[in-house]
Amino acid sequence: FPRYQIGESMVSGMAPLMEELGLVAELDARFQHKSGITLRWGKDPEPWRSDFSAAFSSTGSHFTHAWHVTRSEFDELLLDNARSLGAKVHEAAQVTEVLKDESGRTTGVVYTQGGETHRATARFVVDASGQGRLLTRRLTQTSWQEDLRNVAVWSYFDSYTPLDHKDDILVEAIEGGGWYWYIH
């Protein structure tokens, strides 16, 4: 950490969790606010909008926005926060084996770090490896649903002409199939 990942615009529902983790002030200081989402979808060419503050207030929440984060910074912020809350963090480690109990439940891993082999067990084992799918690859055979084998392409643009709400996420359907997600 940090390591490069494509940026992320968080969904507004993440705000209460970020508050529970004590990260709202840090997120507000470091990352761009997203006030809503504008969509251009279906047969109607006119865009429509969902305002995050209105959505939050309808649930009794005090939040007004979500964030667009730089993933490398956000991931490091989450890792450091977990460490400060007492999580034992192992970096530069390689999982070599998944441990299971007699019933087949995953109970831990064997990993190498600094040339030494270690064993870690826990009541809950969480695979936070993202698209790497470390545990999935070791525990199950991946099967793909053929009609959902999609392709994603990403790029950065130097400039654009925003719609009325420049801090919104923009999602637009593309004629003939597909869509794009634009984050300013």
Model-inferred region functions:
Residues R3-E46:
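N-terminal FAD cofactor-binding segment of flavoenzymes
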Residues Y4, W67-H68, T112:
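A generic secondary-structure micro-motif detector
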Residues I6, T70, F74, E116:
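Conserved acidic
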Residues L23-E26, L77, N81, L85:
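Generic non-transmembrane alpha-helical segments
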Residues E46-F52, H118-A120:
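Short beta-strand segments
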Residues F52-G60, R123-V125:
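A short, sequence-level motif marking secondary-structure junctions
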Residues S58-N81:
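Short beta-strand to alpha-helix junction loop
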Residues D80-H184:
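Predominantly flavin-linked oxidoreductase catalytic cores and closely associated redox partners
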